[in-house]
Amino acid sequence: MYDVIVVGAGPAGSTAAKTLAEKGRKVLLAERAKMPRYKSCSGQLIQKTLDLVERYFGEPVPLSTMCTPTENRGVILTDDRGNTFRFEQSGRNVWRSSFDKWLADKAAAAEAEVAKETAALACEQRSDAVTVTLKSGEHTYTEQARYVVDGEGVTGTLKRKLTGQEPEYITTYQTYNQGSIALDPHFFYAWLQPDLSQYDAWFNVKDGQLVLGVSVRDSERIDEYFARFIAYMQEKHGLRIEKQLKEDRWLLHRVRPGCPIDHGVGRVLFAGETAGFLNPMGEGVSSAIESGHRLGEAMEAHFDDPKAVLSAYATAARPLQDYMKRQWHLVSAMSDAFGDMKI
């Protein structure tokens, strides 16, 4: 039997696994994909994330995980009235495939057992343990643990099966392109005008590739909004696309007013986006790392008392939720579409 089975080797899961393994706990970190695996994400690590990585992983984000330009200098936001706001801070530009693998390798170095290409299909709780059904290739089997940490993110199934709740989603679509544009590649740009998206539209650069994307509530309208955004970028910023290299679609958790957080059910605890932590513009890495660490600390401090674990985790994670509320409140002042997010 494991002390803890962690599902999902993203920032939340790997941080929780490393934190608990360093405490001497027997930890299984199960990742359904082959690593390194692609993750649809801007890969812009803000200063807060860089500080957390140094604090919890003992070293700076390595250059091997980064793409060019390696330095991110902040965010430039355009509100729904066309006004531009510049928020400068130091950050890094990474490929999530490389960054997430590095985090999982750090968990493995702390003696967490990492099971790659292993999906968690279901879990069944008892008073003293959790039975998890896992599948690796054609082999389906079960493992037991005292606790489960669900860090699968928005596309995971364990939480939906446990709670019976179907989450609300935001659909994202982005393309990677060869071309040129009259914007500074060191910044992440976002636009909140309602004619360009139903959530936000964005631009950033990764290894010379121009990344352009939109997010919508109604997935059937994504092509319409994307075409409008491209036309806007051509007119306003001199976008010229020579060749589209890649496209992807993804889902985001739709954050509701009050930024509700679901910390877990019984012996199954939720971290990162699974719990509901997600900041504006899809920035979730900082809260994923911090929630994973705080969950691991709460679990270790009260290991024999599941109710105390859940309570301690909720208390420890409250500052993350408060930070999230403040961030969404700021965006609510920039776009009427987010008016219900005012504090």
Over which residues does each language-model region extend?
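Beta1/beta-strand and adjacent pyrophosphate-binding region of the FAD-binding site
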Residues: 1-10
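N-terminal Rossmann-fold NAD(P) dinucleotide-binding loop
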Residues: 13-14
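N-terminal FAD cofactor-binding segment of flavoenzymes
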Residues: 33-75
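Glycine-rich FAD pyrophosphate-binding loop
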Residues: 9, 21-41
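Predominantly flavin-linked oxidoreductase catalytic cores and closely associated redox partners
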Residues: 106-239, 277
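Short beta-strand to alpha-helix junction loop
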Residues: 85-106, 217-225
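C-terminal helical "tail/cap" subdomain of flavin- and related membrane-associated enzymes
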Residues: 297-343
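FAD/FMN-dependent oxidoreductases across multiple families
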Residues: 220-294, 298, 303-304
